Each structure stands twice: as structure tokens, then as C-alpha cells.
Amino acid sequence: MEGNPYLDRLYEMKVFGKWDPTEVEVRDPGLKDYICLKPMYLPHTGGRHAKKRFAKAEVPIVERLINRVMRTEKNTGKKHLAYNIVKRAFDIIHERTGENPIQVLVQALENAAPREETTTIIYGGISYHEAVDSSPQRRLDIALRLITEGAQQRAFRNPKPIEECLAEEIIAAARYDTECHSIRRKEEIERIAEAAR
């Protein structure tokens, strides 16, 4: 019996036509259910998840990165520009590491996701900070935000293009380099939470 040609094509789908998300491994058990590695030709779901609670866990992780890049200052609302930035950044990551850029991105997210943070509690008119564990969804949101903030800061008043800065930030976070913005901020968040116990 021959296989279904539609299903065969479906399983051959690669992000940007190059990178296979099915061979990516998520090592962090807390983030495993929230990092979506669904294969798709074009990482663009059109905001179908916007009104459903926890539905962003079903949005492919590459699209979530594109959406975060799109939300920064002069890139606001320009999805095609953000798409091209991430596409070129993935090419740079592959050139420098020789690995699947989606795997490098997943490692960077696992390393940049803070495990605990603080919340403000007001008791008897006095406010103080209390350490709390971060939910997996929030950990992923913070990691994406820190990585894109780091890339934006590297590119500001710098002749390097944003895609190169994004690639450098992702590679540095994947290697747990404490000089990069995302890892430095993550450690700062966890240090403040430890002091507030």
C-alpha cells in the first residue's frame, strides 16, 4: 500500500524551507509542553490564538520569536520585515555553529528562562517582595522578551545589522554566556528572588 502523498509532503515541511523542527529536542521538562515544534511552511498563524487562554502554547516557537522581533520600536507591525530578520539570523546561526538553528534557539530559551521571580505583596499597608516560582508559559515569554531585548540593544547605534545581533544573542544564550543580555538579566531576576525569600 502506497503512502498518502499529502501526508508525505506534510512530514517533509521545514521552517523557511531549510530547518526541520521534528529533529529538535527539548531538554527542559517544564517547557516541553509549551515549546511548539509543529512543522509548517510559513510561520504565520494569523493571530487565531489571541482570544483563547493558553492557546499561544500551540503557536510554533519560530513564529513567537518573529512576533517578538516585530514588537520592538521601528519594527512594530512589520511582520514580513521581522520574518526576514529571523530567517537571515537562522542562516548566520547555522554558519557559525553548524547546528540546526531551531535547536540552538530552544537551548537559548531553556537557558534564558528564569525559574523564579518576585511579586509584590501588600499586607497591612506595607508592600514587600515575595519570591514565587514562574509558570512554564511565563518563563518562555520572559526568555523570548530578554533575547529580543538583547538583540535590540546590541544593534542600537551599531553598524551591525539586527539579524547578526539576534544571531549572536541566541548563540550566546545557548552557550550560557553570562556576558549576553538575556543570561545576565535572568541571573539578576533569580538573584533578586533568592534575596526576597
Swiss-Prot record:
User: Gene Ontology cellular component?
Assistant: small ribosomal subunit
Choose any GO biological process term that the UniProt entry carries and state it. Answer: translation
Q: Does the keyword Ribosomal protein apply?
A: yes
Note whether DNA repair occurs among the keywords: no
What keywords tag this UniProt record?
A: Ribonucleoprotein, Ribosomal protein, RNA-binding, rRNA-binding
Task: Output one GO MF annotation.
Answer: structural constituent of ribosome
**UniProt cross-references to InterPro entries, sorted A to Z:** Ribosomal_uS7, Ribosomal_uS7_arc, Ribosomal_uS7_CS, Ribosomal_uS7_dom, Ribosomal_uS7_dom_sf, Ribosomal_uS7_euk/arc
What task does this protein carry out?
A: One of the primary rRNA binding proteins, it binds directly to 16S rRNA where it nucleates assembly of the head domain of the 30S subunit. Is located at the subunit interface close to the decoding center.
Q: Which HAMAP family does this UniProt record tie to the protein?
A: Ribosomal_uS7_A
Which family does the similarity line name? Belongs to the universal ribosomal protein uS7 family.
Oligomer and partners: Part of the 30S ribosomal subunit.
PANTHER family membership: RIBOSOMAL PROTEIN S7
Q: What is this protein called?
A: Small ribosomal subunit protein uS7
What organism is listed for this UniProt entry?
Methanopyrus kandleri (strain AV19 / DSM 6324 / JCM 9639 / NBRC 100938)
